[in-house]
């Protein structure tokens, strides 16, 4: 699956190498 960046508005497609929290989902 693709990594999605966790943001206040939901999950945005993000890079897994970035220092941030992630969730797995589809939007």
Curated annotation (Swiss-Prot):
GO cellular component, one term: extracellular region
Protein keywords: Ion channel impairing toxin, Neurotoxin, Secreted, Toxin, Voltage-gated sodium channel impairing toxin
Positions of the LCN-type CS-alpha/beta domain: 1-27
Location(s), subcellular: Secreted
Primary site of residence: secreted
Tissue and organ expression note: Expressed by the venom gland.
Record text about domains: Has the structural arrangement of an alpha-helix connected to antiparallel beta-sheets by disulfide bonds (CS-alpha/beta).
Family the entry assigns: Belongs to the long (4 C-C) scorpion toxin superfamily. Sodium channel inhibitor family. Beta subfamily.
Function, in words: Beta toxins bind voltage-independently at site-4 of sodium channels (Nav) and shift the voltage of activation toward more negative potentials thereby affecting sodium channel activation and promoting spontaneous and repetitive firing. This toxin is active against mammals and also affects neuromuscular preparations of frog.
The name this protein goes by in its record: Toxin TdII-4
Origin organism lineage: Eukaryota, Metazoa, Ecdysozoa, Arthropoda, Chelicerata
